[in-house]
Every structure is written in C-alpha cells, then in structure tokens.
C-alpha cells in the first residue's frame, strides 16, 4: 500500500501566518490551539494540493495575509509517483494561482494524479441542508479518490459549458462551433455520470460492509443523465446532445445551461429511519457524514491500495464517548497521515500519546 503524506509544509504570507515551517512524518498529527490561532488555515493550505479551491472553497484574494500581494504554500510530499516538491502561490495583483510539481507548472485538476485527500470540517456538517451544488462537489471529490481523471473531466465540462453560455448570451453566430461544444459536453457528461454511479456503488457496498458506531446511509444521485443510464437507455451521448440543442433558446434567455450533469444532486438517506439526511437532527447529520467519510477511507484504501491524507477539523466536538472512542480506534488503525485540530486534549488523551503534537 502507498501512503500519501507530507514530510514538510511551509507557509509564507498565508492567512494569519507570515512564515511557518512544519516537519512531519507518516503519523497522526494534532494541531492544538485556541480558536483563531490558525489551525484550520493549516488544513486549508494542505488541501490546496488537491483539485479545487481547498476545504473552504476560498477566493484567491482571501488567502493572502492582509496587506500582502502574494502568498506561497510549499510541501515536500510523498506522492503517488514518489517523493516530490509541490508549490502553489497566489498573487492579488494578477488574481492568479500557479501550482508546480518539481518546479514544473501543472493544472489544478492534475493534482489528483499525484495526491489523494479526504477532509471533514464543521462547515460540511450543513451539507445536507445546503444547495445541491455543495453535495455534488462533495460527491465529485469522493470520485477523485477512485478515479484521478475525474477532476480533469469536471474541469473540461465546466470550460465547455462556459463557452456554450458565452456563445448563446452574446449571440455569436457560429452553429458549427456550438455543435462541436455540445458534442464534447455530451461525451464528457457520459463519463462523469458513469464515474459517479460506479463510485456510489463502491461507496454503498463500503457503508453496508463497515460495522461501526455511526448510522448507515443509503446513497443515490438525482440527475436526468444518471437516471437514464440506470434505466439502461442506449445512445446516452446522442440523447444529451439533443437535449442541449433543444434548450438553446431557453438557455440564451436564462444566461446559463439548464440541463446537464452539473444539475445533479447527491442524495443521502438515514438507512434505518428511511428519511433523507436533511430531515435528521444536526447530531445525526454529523454522524452520517462521518460514516460516509469512514467508508470512503476504508474502501479507497482497499480498492486503490493508496492511503490518502485525512484532514479533520474539530471532528471530536459534540461526539459522545462511545463514538469518539470508536473513531479514534478506527483512525489509528488505518496507518496513514492524519491531521486533527482541537482546542484541548480532553477525551482524546490516549490518541494524543500516539500523535505528533503541534501547539499554535
């Protein structure tokens, strides 16, 4: 099994840190400090070495230290391809982010070729009651760990969708180019939808197989394209192309694409109660979310033989003793690099004895 882990992390002008240097190894790491000390900022910096905008989905201008034009995050990381140096930097003046692998520029969506990462934050605990966009992105992040090429597909789809919207809204008379774009969107959509369905099948099996102290969930996806595939419809690409063609006039008025895999919703049910997670209590929602994360970790390791980095922000807060103890035993048994934030060690003393403590 390959372990993805950080050997070192350097921050320059990042959030509240002017300069920070951390040396780590493939063991659990506990970041301990008062609220506002920068614990979550460190997790966010690590998450930037995975496709997307990090665990906060922050705008570039917000990650640089106040009054500074640039910020830099550097990591020496044991990746899927071996030991490598990764850097990502931002400049307010250009509003650009540049990511490098061993001093060679790479696209953000290429990061899943090198790293594997899972995170859980307090913000995510509202994912079941927020908009479908958050849930869909959560599902796609899970897919990245099973299929690294999925991130590139999602990025390409969003690019072509933006191009289509531009042609329609600006009334650019180029039916040829529009047809090509819609055909590309249709082909990519087919791959995205199938990847999601395949991953959900893996995940459901993982949830059903894993006996733990957290409630089991039933996972599904509510999307026209995914449903057509499940129903055995043939010529999916032709179907999507036709739908995009038929919605041109409507989308021109709306200024957006009204049909496609970007409209799908990730649905989660409390298995025992047979109700959607959004109707469960906040405590149950957190427990269900943890159960999904545990299943993802467990199955990703079994299926891909790669242990990702796990980032947990205040995960032990509001957990009862039984669930806290189970979670600690599960996590320490995974033999992977785990980053945990906390304001104190109460209730996790035994876990702390096996971890590297970093006080902020």
Curated annotation (Swiss-Prot):
Tell me yes or no: is DNA damage among this UniProt entry's keywords.
yes
The yes or no answer to whether the keyword Cell cycle is present is no
InterPro entries recorded = DNA-binding_RecF (IPR001238), DNA-binding_RecF_CS (IPR018078), P-loop_NTPase (IPR027417), RecF/RecN/SMC_N (IPR003395), RecF_2 (IPR042174)
The protein's GO terms of the molecular function aspect are: ATP binding; single-stranded DNA binding
Q: Which SUPFAM superfamilies does this UniProt record tie to the protein?
A: P-loop containing nucleoside triphosphate hydrolases (SSF52540)
One of the record's GO cellular component terms:
cytoplasm
Question: Could you tell me the keywords of this UniProt record?
Answer: ATP-binding, Cytoplasm, DNA damage, DNA repair, DNA replication, DNA-binding, Nucleotide-binding, SOS response
- Record-linked PROSITE patterns: RECF_1, RECF_2
The record's subcellular location field reads: Cytoplasm
Name one process (GO BP) from the record. Answer: SOS response
Which positions are annotated as binding ATP?
A: 33-40
Its biological function?
The RecF protein is involved in DNA metabolism; it is required for DNA replication and normal SOS inducibility. RecF binds preferentially to single-stranded, linear DNA. It also seems to bind ATP.
Entry similarity comment: Belongs to the RecF family.
Q: What is this protein called?
A: DNA replication and repair protein RecF
The coding gene here is: recF
């Amino acid at each position: 099994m390959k372990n993805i882990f950080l050997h070192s992390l350097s921050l320059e002008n990042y959030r509240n840190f002017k300069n920070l240097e951390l040396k780590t190894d493939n063991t659990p790491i506990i970041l301990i400090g008062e609220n506002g000390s920068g614990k979550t900022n460190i997790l966010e910096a690590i998450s930037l070495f995975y496709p997307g905008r990090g665990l906060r989905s922050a705008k570039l201008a917000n990650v640089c230290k106040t009054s500074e034009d640039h910020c830099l995050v550097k990591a020496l990381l044991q990746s899927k391809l071996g030991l490598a140096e990764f850097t990502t930097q931002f400049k307010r003046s250009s509003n650009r982010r540049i990511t490098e692998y061993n001093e060679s520029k790479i696209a953000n969506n290429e990061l899943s070729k090198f790293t594997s990462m899972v995170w859980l934050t307090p913000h995510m605990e509202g994912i079941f009651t927020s908009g479908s966009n958050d849930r869909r992105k959560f599902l796609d992040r899970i897919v990245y760990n099973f299929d690294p090429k999925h991130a590139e597909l999602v990025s390409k789809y969003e690019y072509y969708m933006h191009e289509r919207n531009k042609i329609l809204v600006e009334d650019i008379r180029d039916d040829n180019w529009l047809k090509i774009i819609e055909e590309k969107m249709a082909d990519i959509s087919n791959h995205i939808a199938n990847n999601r369905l395949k991953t959900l099948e893996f995940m459901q099996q993982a949830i059903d197989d894993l006996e733990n102290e957290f409630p089991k969930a039933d996972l599904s996806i509510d999307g026209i394209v995914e449903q057509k595939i499940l129903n055995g419809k043939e010529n999916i690409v032709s179907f999507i192309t036709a739908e995009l063609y038929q919605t041109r006039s409507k989308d021109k008025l709306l200024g957006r694409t009204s049909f496609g895999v970007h409209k799908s919703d990730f649905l989660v049910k409390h298995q025992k109660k047979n109700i959607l997670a959004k109707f469960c209590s906040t405590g149950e929602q957190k427990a269900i979310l943890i159960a999904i994360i545990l299943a993802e970790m467990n199955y990703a390791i079994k299926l891909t033989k790669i242990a990702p980095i796990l980032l947990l922000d205040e995960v032990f807060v509001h957990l009862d003793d039984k669930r806290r103890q189970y979670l600690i035993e599960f996590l320490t048994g995974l033999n992977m690099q785990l980053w945990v934030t906390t304001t104190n060690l109460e209730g996790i003393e035994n876990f702390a004895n096996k971890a590297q403590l970093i006080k902020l």
